[in-house]
Amino acid sequence: MIRRIVAGLLAVSLGASAYAYEEITVTEGGTLTGTVTLQGQIPKPKGYNLTTLPDAIYCGRISDGRGWRLLQPFDVGGDGAFRQVVVLLEDIERGKAFGPYTPPRIEARDCRFVPFVNVVRDHHDVVVINMDPAMHDIQAYETSQLGPRVLFNVPLPISTRYPREAGLSAHFHKHFEGTPVTQTVKMTKGRHIFTMQCGFHAYMESWALVVDHPYFALTDERGRFQIADIPPGTYKVTIWHPYVHDSYERTVTIKPKEETTADFTVAVPTGRLYANQMVENAYVRYTVTEEVQSQIVPTLEKQTY
């Protein structure tokens, strides 16, 4: 089922490449560095009533203590350092080689897909691994203004090393690796956004920007990025995050063997950002016994916002 995480995010668009990227030897390349900062109060997280979804006890090891699981899409550090943002050179036709490809590894760990933001090369693989004693199901889509398209939908095997009671416990914190699932990402021409969600646990999301050249970076813990070996010239630089709808771009001129700086300040999105939000009544949809409520205990992480 295509969930509401796709709706409302289709305004995010990157220019479609009308050329095949050409790999060349770059000897006089320059470097682009900078930071991405989120300005304003960090939005409230998405909220999911654990009693309406499977594995409430095990997945409730990370929760707010009132039966809600939170998902904060905005990873922000001190001084507004905006982490897990992709910075990309647009429409670069030739440059350095990709180098050896290592498929992104996405783990289902503690009922989360980690990492939340990735970069994937088009027509190449991603590897997804279940580290939990709970059943997870990958539902992967490509998105654009024209709507989503299913890329693949496969279950994630559970490791046979888990004891049977592990998935029913709020106190089992060991992780064993299930059989890896490898899938090839093949995007429709002009589409660049890949999203993955668990079919059983709606709060498990992972996103990726799909690229056809190696001139990109993912911001670090301090919101910094660096892109090296850029052929001299003038380029458009853009940023991408799955929950930032406005476009941000800069024009930069790269000089031989010199460093150029481009900083981005992103305004906090306004309005209702998500379909799923926490409400004050912790068990708003169903009558839940005190026994079940008492079993949903944040023994691994008590979430706050």
What are these regions (language model features)?
Residues 7-16:
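Bacterial N-terminal signal peptides
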Residues 20-305:
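Extracytoplasmic copper-binding redox domains, predominantly the cupredoxin/blue-copper superfamily
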